[in-house]
């Protein structure tokens, strides 16, 4: 079994996803009701995928997911990943003093632009600011959207030593521009300028 979400890297709408079921897997619905396809039957049909898809399908969401997948196939996953890594490098190079921040992941990998093992996001904190506070400032003062907190991965943050507050997650994508990343770096630096340098030594 392989479950996936559609609204992240696949560029689909929220509320989309899927479950890939291997031929050897034997699974059955844990609760049954109206199937939408054969309302006279009290149980789900035996054929797939209808056996696992009760009710009215999310047609608009699936159509959007299909278009997202088409874009990925047309642009190429490696090409998109290369662009995302370059955008992170632009952000890193645009910061006045990257060492003032706490980085999670290999910041030298970003600076070197090789990006080996990194996807289009980075966890970053500014000592002196809780991640949620930093995210609120970026939103309210600079109209920059980031994600703060544990990112649905509390055990990963326990491993990183960032539990329970988490990190500020900066995510980039296919449509992210170098200008946007430079503006984001300027916003981070403006917030950092309000913190005494001795209280803002990154790790």
Which residues does each PLM region occupy?
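Pyridoxal 5′-phosphate
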Residues: 1-203
């Amino acid at each position: 079994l392989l479950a996936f979400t559609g609204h992240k890297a696949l560029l689909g709408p929220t509320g989309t996803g899927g479950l890939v079921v291997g031929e050897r897997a034997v699974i059955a619905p844990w609760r049954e009701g109206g199937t939408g396809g054969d309302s006279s039957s009290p149980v789900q049909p035996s054929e797939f995928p209808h056996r696992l898809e009760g009710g009215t399908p999310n047609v608009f969401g699936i159509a959007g997911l299909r278009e997202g997948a088409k874009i990925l196939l047309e642009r190429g996953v490696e090409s998109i990943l290369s662009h995302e890594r370059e955008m992170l490098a632009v952000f890193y190079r645009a910061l006045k003093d990257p060492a003032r921040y706490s980085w999670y992941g290999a910041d030298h990998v970003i600076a070197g632009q090789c990006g080996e093992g990194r996807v289009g996001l980075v966890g970053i904190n500014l000592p002196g600011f809780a991640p949620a506070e930093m995210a609120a400032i970026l939103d309210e003062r600079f109209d920059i959207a980031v994600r703060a907190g544990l990112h649905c991965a509390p055990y990963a943050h326990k491993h990183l030593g960032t539990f329970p507050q988490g990190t500020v997650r900066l995510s980039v994508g296919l449509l992210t521009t170098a200008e946007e990343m430079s503006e984001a770096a300027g916003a981070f630096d403006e917030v950092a300028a309000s913190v005494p340098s001795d209280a803002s030594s990154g790790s």
